[in-house]
UniProtKB/Swiss-Prot annotation:
EC number: 3.2.1.17
Organism taxonomic ancestry: Eukaryota, Metazoa, Chordata, Craniata, Vertebrata
Chain ranges of the C-type lysozyme domain: 16-143
GO cellular component: extracellular region
UniProt protein name: Lysozyme C
InterPro entries xref list: Glyco_hydro_22, Glyco_hydro_22_lys, Lysozyme-like_dom_sf
CDD domains: LYZ_C (cd16897)
Compartments where found: Secreted
Stretch forming the signal peptide: 1-15
Main location: secreted
GO biological process: defense response to bacterium; killing of cells of another organism
Domain of life, source organism: Eukaryota
Length: 143
């Protein structure tokens, strides 16, 4: 019983909740501003509505799949959580999306938007970011 609690605490210790401008700076430094024509503000908006900038975010879907990490990347298509059949197009374990090192999450997000659906693959972007003024998401960040 003590081991699962330890593992939970270990997972939480490796998670990070970014501040808006901090996250925008990380995304910009990792080449996300303009990647595949997607603005930095779009990425920040998407992350806000998907995870509240939380690398440890998790959401269980009605189809049995799970969304992981700051971008809420889905286990049916993009990562393997050993729970359901997966395409695993990013060729990663889903747990790699839930650490404070966002390299894997960013690389997988780049893979997601390389598909024809692009950023429209994210429901939160469609609902909260598409065709909106997103300037507030990077305002005051000095970018």
């Amino acid at each position: 019983m003590k081991i699962p609690v330890f593992l939970l605490l270990l997972a939480l210790a490796n998670a990070k909740v970014f501040q808006r401008c901090e996250w925008a700076r990380v995304l910009k430094a990792r080449g996300m501003d303009g990647y595949r024509g997607i603005s930095l503000a779009d990425w920040v908006c998407l992350s806000k509505w998907e995870s509240q900038y939380n690398t440890n975010a998790i959401n269980h879907n009605t189809d049995g799949s799970t969304d992981y990490g700051i971008f809420q990347i889905n286990s049916r298509w993009w990562c393997n959580d050993d729970r359901i059949p997966t395409r695993n197009a990013c060729n990663i374990k889903c747990s790699a999306l839930q650490t404070d090192d966002v390299t894997v999450a960013i690389n997988c997000a780049k893979r997601v938007v390389s598909d024809p659906q692009g950023i429209r693959a994210w429901v939160a972007w469609n609902r909260h970011c598409q065709n909106r003024d997103l300037s507030a998401y990077i305002a005051g960040c000095g970018l």
